[in-house]
From Swiss-Prot:
This is SsrA-binding protein. Pfam families: SmpB. Residues 132-153 are annotated as: Disordered. NCBIfam families: PRK05422.1 (NF003843), smpB (TIGR00086). It comes from Campylobacter hominis (strain ATCC BAA-381 / DSM 21671 / CCUG 45161 / LMG 19568 / NCTC 13146 / CH001A). InterPro entries: SmpB, SsrA-bd_prot, SsrA-bd_prot_CS. Belongs to the SmpB family. Gene3D superfamilies: 2.40.280.10. The keyword RNA-binding applies.
Length: 153
């Protein structure tokens, strides 16, 4: 499994509740661009439209040598492929509990197919983000103190 791109902001802005794997409908030039690392999931999100799941606002740059006729839009909606039962479960959670569906990463599976890792997530408040940063900083300081103690300084 080779990770092509990752949404690091999702872990900072959301509390991840459950992960899912979804196929993604792409054109050939988009797959080439992904393999070259020309993608960004920073502000991307998923939405259910007419019973189908779409990845919105994911930026996949087109290649310069792609014919202008075949160039897909860089931020266009891309259909995600999941079982109907999973989509209905996501729809129920999003509509009832105020959750969001967030794209975490795009990767190649063992059969070299591009897959999207999406998550059911709940937004963090500002104080939750600050607590997480404080906790991370405290862990980092504790680790460095343990290393210094082990070395004998």
């Amino acid at each position: 499994m080779k990770e092509l791109t990752k949404n690091k902001k999702a872990w900072h802005n959301f509390t991840i509740i459950e992960n899912f794997e979804a196929g993604i409908v792409l054109k050939g030039s988009e797959v080439k661009a992904l393999r070259m690392g020309r993608a960004n999931l920073k502000d991307s999100f998923c939405r259910i439209i007419k019973g189908e799941l779409f990845l919105l606002n994911a930026h996949i740059s087109f290649l310069e040598n792609t014919n202008a006729f075949f160039r897909p839009s860089e931020n266009g909606a891309r259909k995600l492929l999941m079982h109907k039962k999973e989509i209905n479960r996501l729809f129920g959670a999003v509509s009832k509990e105020g959750m969001a569906i967030v794209a975490l990463s795009l990767y190649l599976n063992d059969k070299n197919k591009v897959k999207a890792r999406i998550a059911l997530a709940k937004g963090k408040n500002l104080h939750d983000k600050r607590e997480a940063l404080k906790r991370k900083e405290a862990e980092r300081e504790a680790q460095s103190a343990m290393k210094r103690y082990a070395k004998g300084y």
